[in-house]
From Swiss-Prot:
This is Ig kappa chain V-V region HP 93G7. The lineage of its organism: Eukaryota, Metazoa, Chordata, Craniata, Vertebrata. Residues 57-88 are annotated as: Framework-3. One of its GO terms (biological process) is adaptive immune response. Residues 1-23 are annotated as: Framework-1. The keyword Disulfide bond applies.
Length: 108
């Protein structure tokens, strides 16, 4: 199986900040990288698919980039509603494995 690693398990930022969350695959996944958002109430939403394509209805402050084994999700102008845990998932090979998640919190 392809292992997905999110080295930062939690991240604290201020409203209005630009935040970048990273993900690394154990082998080349040919840009088949998705990002999911899990809200504190458990709701899960697909944000980005195929590295950089925004899912329908996702605000343009979310963007994705990367290639090969290294990928990132950037949130520009962080809003309160963005407080959640973010997971990367590779879709290049079955099983479609996930990273361990990065929990984003507001800096106090």
């Amino acid at each position: 199986d392809i292992q997905m690693t999110q080295t930062t398990s939690s991240l604290s930022a201020s409203l209005g900040d630009r935040v970048t969350i990273s993900c690394r695959a154990s082998q080349d996944i040919s840009n088949y990288l998705n990002w999911y958002q899990q809200k504190p109430d458990g709701t899960v939403k697909l944000l980005i698919y195929y590295t950089s394509r925004l899912h329908s209805g996702v605000p343009s402050r979310f963007s994705g980039s990367g290639s090969g084994t290294d990928y990132s999700l950037t949130i520009s102008n962080l809003e309160q509603e963005d407080i959640a845990t973010y997971f990367c998932q590779q879709g290049n090979m079955l099983p479609r494995t996930f990273g361990g998640g990065t929990k984003l919190e507001i800096k106090r």
